[in-house]
Regions:
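Short, structured coil segments at secondary-structure junctions
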Residues: 62-63, 97
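Substrate-binding cleft of extracellular glycoside hydrolase catalytic domains
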Residues: 42, 49-54, 69-153
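Surface-exposed substrate-engagement region within the catalytic domains
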Residues: 55-61, 130-136, 151-198
Length: 198
């Protein structure tokens, strides 16, 4: 089954047309796309996916070093996320192809975002992350990344996200894991200032 099978031909063509039209509009206006710059040498790329599961040889042939995989269940209404959660078969396939796998936890999104529950949310979500990470062959001593898949305000960070991350970190450490933070630049910067995550 193709990873793109859920994408209809019509939707694909609409998206492609919009992308092309946007490129011409930016070029005509003299606008260039923003560039990201790494702080050090780029070592390679990893991919993040939830809609389906490509096999390890495909990931390797595309030149990636590995993948970032979800150690969380599909949320209600997201049945299309056939790649959640990661499985032991998938991690073994990637290892057999010389690839690395990083674990990331994200269940809710938007109105149901995990972090919106603050510290109480970590008590629910961290044990699930640990259980699914271990079931997929994830070793101790490695980070489990916690996703903050939003563009939060400083107030949301201070009142909900920081308590969520702090409690999540404490639970992970108590079980022999570390925590990473998978978020936008501002959120990562705030977390670094608070000594949260890697």
């Amino acid at each position: 089954m193709s990873i793109f099978s859920a994408l209809s031909r019509r939707r694909f063509l609409q998206t492609a047309a919009l992308t092309i039209a946007s490129s011409f509009a930016f070029a005509a206006a003299g606008i260039t796309a923003p560039q990201a710059f790494a702080l050090g040498p780029v070592l390679g790329t990893v991919i993040d996916y939830a809609a389906g599961v490509p096999d390890g040889s495909t990931i390797k042939e595309a030149g990636h070093l590995g993948s970032v995989r979800y150690v969380s269940q599909r949320r209600p209404g997201a049945e299309w996320m056939l790649g959640k959660p990661v499985t032991i078969e998938e991690t073994k396939d990637q290892a057999a192809n010389g690839l690395k796998v990083a674990s990331i936890y994200q269940f809710g999104k938007d109105e149901t975002a995990d972090w919106k529950q603050g510290a109480a949310g970590a008590a629910v979500h961290a044990p699930q992350a640990i259980q699914l990470h271990a079931a997929a062959g994830g070793p101790k001593g490695r980070p489990i990344y916690v996703a903050i898949d939003d563009n939060p305000s400083r107030e949301e960070y201070d009142n909900q996200i920081r308590p969520y991350l702090k409690a999540f970190d404490e639970i992970l450490k108590s079980q022999g894991y570390t925590m990473g933070v998978y978020a936008n630049y501002g959120t990562i910067d705030w977390a670094i200032q608070d000594g949260l995550g890697s």
